[in-house]
Amino acid sequence: MGNKDDDGEQQQQQQQQPRGGGGDDDDDDNENSTKTTVFLGVPITSETSAIALVYFVQGVIGLASLAKSFFLKDELHLSPSEAAVVTSISSLPWLVKPLWGFISDTVPLFGYKRKSYLCLMGVLGCLAWSTLSQGVAVVDNRWTASFLFAVGSLSIAFSDVLIDSIVVERARESEDNSTTGSLQSLCWGMVAFGGIASSYFSGELVEEKGSAFVFACTAVFPLLIAGAAFLVKEEKQDEMSSSIETTTVVNVVDGGECKEPETIPTASAEEKNGGVVEAGKETLSTLWSVVKQKQIWGPALFMYLWQATPSPGSAMFYFSTNELHFSPEFLGRVSFARSLAALGGVGLYNAYFKYVPLKKMFTYSAVLATALGSTQLLLVSGYNRELGISDELFALTDSAVLTVLGEISFLPVLVLAAKICPKGVEATLFASLMSLFNFGGVTSQFLGAGLTEKLGVTADNFDNLFELVAICNFTTLLPLVAIGFLNEVEQREEEGDDSDGEEGQKMIQA
């Protein structure tokens, strides 16, 4: 998701045009060569196969999620707050996705901007998970675990940026919006398929084989990323260069009136000496020219606050396993239900909520999240049993409902990010906004860890868990104090000025 756009059909058709003269037989051969297999409206070529593979790995890598939690709890014997810190550190590579894009764009590795990095990330991911599969014999402290989990995240985050760049390139080559949308569906479909498959088996594997075995299985998946590199069509480059083009930025003054478009040059086309430094300076200068405007940083701040409220996730995991005695297999079923519920949330949003104004959507979402999130207090207090509802049934249904609401609340964030991206810097700014959103998630985990420590919630002491969950739940309303920053976005919506958002919305892949 991130997050998490489009197609290469036109390029394929161009590649299949006759290159020379020939008779009827040649024409027949060419006619047959244009008949390709189509899946979800996307012609299956080597490059679309590479895209599908990388997105599938993004979903299936979740196989290790439950094993990771049990490894930190049962084998490293970390407290809930310590486990939350490790989880936060492992998310750091997702915070600097624009950096990975900049590196691949300006510093070709062995002559390639995409293929070589995909291979490298696949190998790094495999090594990280293989090392983790050795268990406490090698990974005997939280810092080693944090480093290895972070390397595993780096392999996915970097490859996500690489494959997204290929998707965007193919989207620009295609003038057909339907094929663009079809490739978007393929991407999301592969992530969903991988996530559902991994969540279904994750709990059972942890319970029967242990975390080390699951990590060993997970080590295989990054190799698919390395394999995908050989399916990508890319010409070898002899020199390091930057291909960031001149961009036009529309500055908006207070009151929503537009000035004349201001042309802001980015990195020059072919920098031979000091190209990386110059490209970096120009890119940062361009980005700063955009983000310093209130109609950009205001909604961006709201996005960060929306994600940054504290979470009791680690404490609830320890409560579920140590107090309620939920088995790994059952927690795997809960994860599977969440994956299905997430798809349901996407469907509900597309069917009923995508045309709701953003301010109204965020306000309703925050209020509903607070109300429905309060149901966790019933589980913590045990009151659900007095109502005749078992802990397992309550946890399963509650997780599914909250996941549906979570997806409905998350998708407007992507729409907001897309709408505030001016033309010319859509990719860079969108990636930066998603990194800021991810940073909000890390902040949430750190704040949750701090509250957990402060309230004295440990692996076997849940006396203050009720207070922890209540505090985290009601802070969900706090981002609404910044809801006014969305006024200009809604004003542009009412005026029908969605041109900036259309380009960014094609890249809704967090």
How should these model regions be labeled?
Residues 111-116, 204-220, 452-475:
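A membrane-interface helix-boundary motif in multi-pass transporters
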Residues 130-136, 221-236, 379-380, 467-498, ...:
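Multi-pass alpha-helical transporter architecture, strongest
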Residues 56, 128-129, 139-159, 387-412:
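Hydrophobic core of transmembrane alpha-helices in multi-pass small-molecule transporters
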Residues 17-44, 239-298, 503:
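Juxtamembrane intracellular "pre-TM" segments in multi-pass secondary transporters
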Residues 31-94, 295-324, 331:
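Helix-loop boundary and gating motifs at the non-cytosolic
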